[in-house]
A protein has these predicted regions:
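Conserved aromatic-histidine-acidic binding/catalytic patches
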Residues: 6-10, 53, 77
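Gram-positive cell-envelope targeting signals
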Residues: 19-22, 28, 42-44, 55-62, ...
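Conserved nucleotide-sugar donor-binding catalytic segment
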Residues: 1-48
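Short, charged, amphipathic alpha-helical segments
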Residues: 77-83, 107
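Catalytic core of nucleotide-sugar-dependent glycosyltransferases
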Residues: 31-39, 45-73, 95, 100-119
Length: 153
């Protein structure tokens, strides 16, 4: 398996595939991955072109997770890809609320998620946080209210 080249959030595409094909996993307290936020990193950039690419690439990742879900032979793998897709969709909604400049841009991302059956967020009981966020973001007007509250931070 390889990282998908030239996209942001390539780890969101790669990691689920890695887990699905691993055969076995070991739980350990060893730190094998460290994430460092840099001021100049892509995810911290306010550049409009980078933000546009970021959301385009997030949708690519959702599409690829859907493809992996359909192609998976084992039921557990199908469920894992499905769950990862739905939880990544939550991340896309949250990032849209935080980063996109206006209601129209947010509405466009929501429409694209809806076309993929990822918004409103599917009813699933992954965690109480997922359920709460799903209820708070199941309508565009609710998202617009939350966006205003986030801007006040």
């Amino acid at each position: 398996e390889r990282f998908l080249p030239d996209i942001y959030h390539e780890d969101e595409d790669f990691t689920p595939r890695l887990f699905a094909r691993s055969g076995s996993l070991i739980s350990t307290n060893l730190m094998v991955y460290a994430y460092y936020q840099r001021q100049e990193s892509i995810v911290n950039s306010g550049n409009a072109d980078r933000i546009k690419k970021r959301f385009s690439d997030m949708l690519v990742v959702i599409d690829r997770l859907e493809e992996q879900e359909r192609a998976a032979e084992e039921e557990l793998s199908r469920y894992a890809f499905h769950r990862r897709k739905e939880q990544f969709a939550l991340s896309v909604v949250y990032q849209a609320m935080r980063l996109l400049p206006g209601k129209e841009a947010v509405a466009d991302v929501l429409r694209q998620l809806a076309d993929r059956h990822c918004w409103p967020l599917p009813k699933a009981r992954y965690s109480w946080r997922y359920s709460l966020f799903r209820h708070l973001t199941d309508r565009e007007w609710k998202i617009n209210v939350l966006r205003q509250l986030l801007k006040r931070k």
